[in-house]
Structures are given as C-alpha cells and as structure tokens.
Amino acid sequence: GKLDVIIIALPFGDAGILPDMAGAPTLKLKLSAFCRLFEESARQTRHENFGLWFGNQFMPRDLGLWGYAAISAPTLGSALETLTNLFCYQQGSSFLRCVRRKDGLLRLEYQIVAPEIVARRQDAELSLGMFLNVIRECCGPKWAPEEVHFEHPRPQAWRDHEEAFAAPVYFSQPTNALIFRSDILERPMPARDLQLLTVMQTCMEKLGPSSQAADGLFGRIRAAIRMRLPGGYPSLEQIAHDLRISPGAVQRELSDHSATYKDA
C-alpha cells in the first residue's frame, strides 16, 4: 500500500548519515543531508512519491519542539505565525512564510534557497504534507486547501498528490505553497496551552542560534536576490522587505563584504 514504504528502514548510510544517530531526539541534520536521505529513500524503494506519503502521515507532534509550539498556540493563525517565526531555529538555507494574495487568499510558502541543493523534490512534498497536517490538527482531517503549488516539474504519478492534499496541485511554480482561505485563522487550536507554547519557544531559542544568523546576512541577501530573479532583477527595497531589514542594512552588509548590490 501507499504507506508501506514508511516502515522501510531508511538508507542512512547511503545518505552519509550514521545509523546510530537516527534515534537521537535532538538530532539536527544538515539540510543537504536531509534532502539526500529522502531522495535516496525514494530511489531505493522505487517509490517516487516517498516524500509525499511520508509527509502525509507525519503528525505535528512528530516535529518535536517546533510542532508542539505550533499546536499549543491559541488559534490557527497564531499557530502558523509560531511556525514561521520559529522556523529559523528549525532549519537553515530555506524560508517559510505566510503571505496574503491580492484576492485575499493566503499562501504558506516554503522553499530551499541553497543553490547547491538541486535534488529537493522529496523534501518539498513531505514539508507541505507536514504543514497541511498542522492545519488539519485544527480544522479536521477532511480540511483541504484551495490549491497546492510545487516548484518541481509534474511527476509521473501526479494524481497521488491531488489525492494526498484533496486539492488541485500545480507544478513548476515559483515556490512550494499551500493556498487557503483566511476565514479559518481565528479557529481555536484544540490543544492550546500558552504555558507550553512559552516553554517550547524558550527551549528552541536556547538550543541553538537562529539558522538565519548561522547562514550570515550576506548569504541571506544573495539567496533572496536569487529567489526573485525569475521575476526580473529585484530592487534593493524588495530584498530589504523580504529580509525584514532596512535598505541601509543591506547596503552596509554588502559594503562589509566589499560587494555592490549587483555583485551579490
């Protein structure tokens, strides 16, 4: 069946990961190693939708501190805000954000911005599946988004994606995203617990520095520019807005690296 592949032992060794590390509850894999692990799993199991179905059954509590923080939030809107705000402590070389479209629909966008990670399809599919289940934790197992977007080309077994998300799925898009109506944001989370939320946030902040800090501002500026290039060369103000810093801060960081805006 579709979920049978989930119980197959993942090929840690082939992905460059020591098997005895697999059970460590606070294990933090480099994003490149994580992506290799799931691409290799899909290859060895000959199940091209491995990441899709892995993410589909991955519950928010399986996300560790990050997941517990989200489901402890008072409303779904604050749960998604918690996910995006704490993402920098969970994973580097990537972004997670929620933006409102002109038509009022919301986009929960996820993308890896490290150019050296080329094979990233499995990661994208399992990640959106995880985020879907955070929303379903609040709205119920039958809730579905309006649309789902993936940046990779349409695979052969693409109808599985529409079954997994119960929604139209579009491929070769600018980013990976769940598109949904905003009227669900005020719904209360069933496991809301402000005290637990505070503890989880504090633990994540103390366990390690923000991955954005680890990536370095200069690297984040370059990644933000690359991300916008398909839509034309971005302005300094656009990049500053994306990074939530002032245009002057962007210019100072470039100057510190003896680079101009166009060099970056």
Which stretches of residues belong to each language-model region?
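Internal, well-ordered alpha-helical segments in soluble enzyme and binding-protein domains
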Residues: 79, 127-130, 196
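N-terminal low-complexity or simple alpha-helical regulatory segments
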Residues: 1-109
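Short acidic/histidine-centered micro-motifs embedded in hydrophobic/aromatic stretches
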Residues: 14-15, 151, 242
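DNA-contacting interfaces and partner/effector-binding or oligomerization modules
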Residues: 95, 99-185
